[in-house]
Amino acid sequence: GYEAGKYVNGAVSPFTAGELAKAAFNNGYEEYGWNIIDRFINLVERDGNISFLYYPDGTQQGNGGPSAWGAAAFISAVDEGLAGIQDIGVSYDEMLFSPKFPVTPYRELRYITGYEMNNTVVDVRYIITEEGMRYDIYSPKSKIHSHILMPKARKCKKLFIDGKEKEYLNELVGNSMYLNFDVISNGKISVEVIFDKSNV
């Protein structure tokens, strides 16, 4: 068998942690998903690299499989979980957009993903204030199925797409509220959520 804290007997596995984070992001446990990502960022910043396995105290285990397994799982967790960008067509001609950025401490950020081989890029800019939040999405011409996480204790008063008011449906996932709507993008759209401040 393995000693306590090694391999299947208690080691911390980045490739498992990445999948757990993605599942948390996509099933109503968004804050837990971010907590996992944040702790992994701290490990990488501390060590300057990624280990295949870690001891429960966070120190690296010197041998094992390829570190790229863990890196790939975390990239997927950020791409499809935190940023919530999923290509459900061909080269993003149809995509799911379900960002979880409100659970992070960032008030403004930019996220870029895509396919290097065919120069397909999805570029998202996010900003949140006391009045609302906004996403500017640069992408190939596509149909975008949007599933937008609302910040805790916030409700949507109005939703605008490129300055025009848009209808949406509320969906509760666990304890998290989402706004659901579909849009057609010709390369760039702006999504603006105005918060209802009457219940704050």
Where are these regions (language model features)?
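Non-catalytic C-terminal accessory modules of carbohydrate-active enzymes
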Residues: 2, 6, 19-200
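Short helix-capping and inter-helix turn/linker motifs at the boundaries of alpha-helical repeat units
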Residues: 10-12
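Alpha-helix N-cap/N′ positions at the starts of helices
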Residues: 15-16
